Swiss-Prot record:
Subcellular location: Cell inner membrane
Binding-site list for ATP: G369, P370, T371, G372, S373, G374, K375, S376
Every ABC transporter domain range: 337-570
Keywords assigned: ATP-binding, Cell inner membrane, Cell membrane, Membrane, Nucleotide-binding, Translocase, Transmembrane, Transmembrane helix, Transport
Gene Ontology BP term (one): xenobiotic export from cell
EC number: 7.6.2.2
Regions that span the bilayer: 23-43, 53-73, 134-154, 155-175, 248-268, 280-300
Species for this entry: Escherichia coli (strain K12)
Name under which the protein is recorded: Multidrug resistance-like ATP-binding protein MdlA
Amino acid sequence: MRLFAQLSWYFRREWRRYLGAVALLVIIAMLQLVPPKVVGIVVDGVTEQHFTTGQILMWIATMVLIAVVVYLLRYVWRVLLFGASYQLAVELREDYYRQLSRQHPEFYLRHRTGDLMARATNDVDRVVFAAGEGVLTLVDSLVMGCAVLIMMSTQISWQLTLFSLLPMPVMAIMIKRNGDALHERFKLAQAAFSSLNDRTQESLTSIRMIKAFGLEDRQSALFAADAEDTGKKNMRVARIDARFDPTIYIAIGMANLLAIGGGSWMVVQGSLTLGQLTSFMMYLGLMIWPMLALAWMFNIVERGSAAYSRIRAMLAEAPVVNDGSEPVPEGRGELDVNIHQFTYPQTDHPALENVNFALKPGQMLGICGPTGSGKSTLLSLIQRHFDVSEGDIRFHDIPLTKLQLDSWRSRLAVVSQTPFLFSDTVANNIALGCPNATQQEIEHVARLASVHDDILRLPQGYDTEVGERGVMLSGGQKQRISIARALLVNAEILILDDALSAVDGRTEHQILHNLRQWGQGRTVIISAHRLSALTEASEIIVMQHGHIAQRGNHDVLAQQSGWYRDMYRYQQLEAALDDAPENREEAVDA
């Protein structure tokens, strides 16, 4: 029953719907008490031979009318009750998605995608079923059960009623024990389903890699193991579930046996008429539904309670980064980074130390360094995926922690290392941040990203569907479409996180030239492994082991002893060797 207490906030808000449904349920329960009474009257009237045919037909017509009214009222309360429960599903999913969208990368490191999807679908469905069918079953069984007991006790015989219901306390104890066991086992079954869902999602999104490495059999075996584990845990739930109905039917059978035995003795003794015993047995038949419903309700509610506890656990997780209260001031501003130290949550080793620089509007910053040196961490801090533990980052001389997240991020356009495209047209992917952009604006940024000609060569040009995650496109095309998408936003700060790694040197040079022209008055931050992408930067910082090892422009660093010069010379030599065969072929042709 704790689920109903946990959902009391919703029941209080939708009290009109639920109260209306409950009122109709009470009316229906009262109407259903009439037919057994009528049957008893008719039986006594027929056995005593004082009923006419007209009287019998009148009572039959009364029962038919009651059946029609009950049918109509059941339709109305179902609309009221289930309409309210479906609205709960909408709100739970909206709250859940809003919570997921507020979370930051650290959250998604701890939670698997398949598990998050299972909570949004399967768990919410269980809660909604409990809020609809569970409430209906609870109210219907209580109202009907109490009404029938009152009629049996007051209108027929309280002694026979008490005698026939002796098995009920044992049944209630068994249902409570089974309900508690069901709650725990269902939580385990839902967790297993989440793992299976996660395995499915991972396998489908990585199907190309699986085929490339010939891992189909291995993945099938892993999936089969997860499916078997899920099946076993659901079977454990089914074993508990299967105990409910036998418990109810044994109790009902015992109650009928006691009622027939005790009632027959009372008829022989003259304290009951045959019609009253017939009515009593019909009332006892009406008790079958409340007893079955009670067991079913425990089943539904315990499943819903286990599911809701999983949803609440997710909704209760506070974001690592808290929203600020101040909007970002209008106009272009200076970005000041002053990081004394930053350490990732649940780790001891600092990821960044003593990183300081200032960027004025119109400047371009290049960031380079070996793998794992802290480049992406620095960009994550600028985007406020995490907050600096010691030091701060300021914009317009205001710490980012004081700025509204939405307001700050609206000033950023980011292209990450792994560009993500939606299963939509090329044009819609470019216009993601500006849905009202014109075709001319879309084509303009595509030209700036040097992808316009590639798009025109696609089957339907800008209207070509790119497939899930852009599966129809090459890596370089996906990167350039992502760059075009960022440029269309026309943000004040553009961040490219190794976003040119999949394009050739000539295309890279053209894109950087276009960015330089486009970026007049804007701040551009480029992180790259290929140093040719940084030659036009106003300043370059070389990251090593989480701190700045070198800084300066390209000309200075190319002459200065250190990582930058060594890597630049190596890449120049590598490029020259790659061009050598082509040069030799041209010489032979000459």
